[in-house]
């Protein structure tokens, strides 16, 4: 079998074409500023310029003007400071070790290109791996401002290849800054799902605290020492990038949407059906939780308009009730289960709930001394799991269902993902076996059941009162933790036993519905761009007018892509 190329070798190929040598920092900045203009369409530059009022692209912007461009709330000072510094660093590209002395339209335009996957690929030939590095650098604390590197000749290629000499291995991002950034992205994923949608700025930040709770789970995934943010624990690039790639691959998509939002005029923005128009929140399925699911699952989540099938609080906690509500749905579903971790089995079964004692007799639990629980699992009591099942439910007292895309997702206290390794990982057992994901079928007799948990599995008893998540590594139908694989800890053994508080099942649209929705959105975006072109032409003869207005063509020769 062939060898998979390393990230380093791939990145070296991306920028293999040598760049010119220039004699000053200012020349290099001008070079990349002008290159950014060549990547953008004239109509996009004109639309962005219209948002600056009477200012030129090279004029400094105030913090208030910057906040208006990015729709940052006046009340959120921490986010304002974080994003201001973030864009000052990005706008200094390629000199990332020092942030710009001022924020300009040129700097923001360059940021738009650098923070979108397709544009940065055209601009520099960089992959998503380099984009993640760039975002991480923007989030790091940086005290140096406008420090000029002493050199007689700058080799641009060397500056690009070394990211201006930044040592990523020793860089960290504050947990509080990461929490604000992830909270912002989650909020935008619901309110800014496309780059050309209208934003309701009055209510945009109303539920910030709710989104922050969800974001906390994602931040805990980036450093297992973090249980509560604000204790000064740093997040390394290695942990940050692994978390993004392994368990939250879509989390940066809203960043692309909000920066490209600046390339549309207000009149060209389209009404987009917000979640509150078709989703009535429940105890579990809230807008913040939908945002979290969107970071890890396919686009079916929001695009297909989730359908409430079963809510235990409304229909009663029973297998029969769940079956009557769910089994007629002929597409993918999301099972949500949340509860409180049972810390002391003996104390709880003898003093609080004698039914739990019987469950322990039926479920062969791991011994406490054989477990390695991370701090977030030891110290946090609330647990929430989602199971994405890409096949209709059915009674399976002997067999199994669930295609290869079935997966277990831990949503709290941290975010993690456990992927199906083979077809058939779910059972719905109506003769006392309950619901199992990753298990073997339980052995059921007249008045007893014996569960057979898999190495990685989620078990719900037949009364929907108790649940257990088990992790012991490879060997079953569900694969081990995507997070733990990074440090070769995929065989770490732990078990989360919990009292179920809520169970819900939600239907996702089928592939046909999703494809239709995607086609509609692409058509609407194309129409918006077409209207932009028409509006631009009504101003006069296209590019000539832009040059006369000083928008393009007066800042040197534009470069091509690398």
From Swiss-Prot:
Family as reported in the entry's similarity comment: Belongs to the RTC5 family.
SMART domains on file: TLDc (SM00584)
Key words of the record: Cytoplasm
TM annotation in the entry: none
Domain of life: Eukaryota
Protein task: May be involved in a process influencing telomere capping.
Biased composition (Basic and acidic residues): 10-21
PROSITE patterns from the UniProt entry: TLDC (PS51886)
Protein name: Restriction of telomere capping protein 5
Ranges of residues in domain TLDc: 283-509
One GO BP: response to oxidative stress
Primary subcellular site in the record, as a coarse category: cytoplasm
GO cellular component, as recorded: fungal-type vacuole membrane; nucleus
Region (Disordered): 1-21
InterPro entries, A to Z: TLDc_dom
Subcellular location: Cytoplasm
């Amino acid at each position: 079998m062939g060898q998979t190329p390393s990230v380093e070798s791939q990145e070296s190929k991306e920028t293999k074409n040598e760049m010119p040598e220039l004699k000053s920092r200012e020349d290099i900045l001008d070079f990349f500023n002008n290159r950014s203009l060549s990547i953008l369409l004239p109509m996009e530059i004109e639309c962005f310029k219209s948002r600056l009022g009477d200012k030129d692209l090279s004029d400094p912007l105030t913090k208030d003007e910057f906040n208006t461009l990015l729709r940052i709330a006046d009340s959120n000072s921490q986010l304002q400071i974080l994003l201001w510094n973030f864009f000052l660093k990005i706008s200094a590209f390629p000199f990332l070790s020092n942030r710009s002395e001022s924020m300009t339209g040129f700097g923001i335009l360059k940021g738009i290109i650098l923070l979108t996957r397709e544009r940065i690929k055209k601009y520099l030939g960089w992959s998503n791996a380099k984009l993640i590095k760039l975002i991480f650098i923007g989030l790091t604390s940086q005290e140096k401002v406008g420090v000029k590197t002493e050199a007689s000749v700058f080799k641009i290629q060397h500056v690009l290849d070394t990211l201006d000499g930044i040592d990523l291995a020793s860089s960290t991002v504050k947990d509080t800054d990461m929490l604000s950034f992830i909270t912002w992205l989650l909020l935008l994923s619901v309110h800014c799902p496309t780059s050309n949608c209208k934003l309701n700025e009055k209510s945009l930040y109303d539920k910030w605290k709710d989104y922050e709770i969800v974001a906390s789970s994602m931040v805990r995934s980036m450093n297992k020492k973090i249980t509560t943010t604000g204790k000064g624990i740093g997040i390394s690039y290695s942990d940050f990038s692994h978390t993004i790639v392994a368990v939250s691959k879509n989390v940066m998509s809203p960043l692309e949407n909000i920066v490209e939002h600046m390339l549309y005029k207000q009149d060209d923005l389209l009404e987009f059906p917000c979640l509150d128009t078709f989703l009535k929140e429940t105890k579990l399925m809230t807008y913040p939780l939908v945002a979290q699911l969107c970071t890890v699952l396919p686009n079916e989540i929001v695009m297909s308009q989730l359908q409430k099938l079963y809510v235990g609080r409304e229909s009663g906690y029973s297998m029969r009730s769940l079956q009557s509500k769910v089994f007629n749905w002929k597409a993918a579903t999301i099972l949500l289960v949340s509860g409180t971790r049972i810390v002391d089995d003996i104390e709880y079964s003898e003093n609080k709930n004698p039914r739990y004692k019987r469950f322990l007799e039926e479920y062969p639990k791991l011994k406490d001394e054989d477990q390695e629980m991370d701090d977030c699992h030891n110290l946090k009591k609330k647990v929430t799991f989602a199971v994405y099942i890409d096949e209709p439910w059915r009674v399976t007292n002997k067999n199994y269902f669930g295609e290869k895309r079935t997966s277990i997702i831990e949503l709290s206290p941290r975010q993690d993902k456990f992927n199906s390794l083979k077809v058939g990982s779910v059972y719905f057992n109506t003769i006392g076996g309950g619901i199992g994901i990753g298990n073997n079928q339980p052995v059921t007799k007249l008045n007893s059941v014996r569960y057979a948990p898999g190495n990685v599995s989620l078990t719900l008893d037949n009364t929907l009162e108790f649940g257990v998540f088990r992790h012991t590594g490879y060997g079953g139908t569900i694969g081990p933790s995507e997070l733990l694989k990074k440090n070769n800890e995929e065989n770490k053994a732990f078990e989360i036993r919990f009292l179920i508080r809520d169970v819900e099942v939600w239907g996702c649209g089928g592939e046909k519905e999703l494809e239709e929705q995607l086609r509609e959105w692409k058509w609407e975006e194309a129409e918006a761009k077409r209207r932009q072109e028409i509006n631009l032409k009504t101003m006069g003869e296209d590019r000539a007018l832009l040059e006369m207005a000083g928008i393009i063509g007066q800042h040197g020769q534009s470069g091509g892509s690398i």
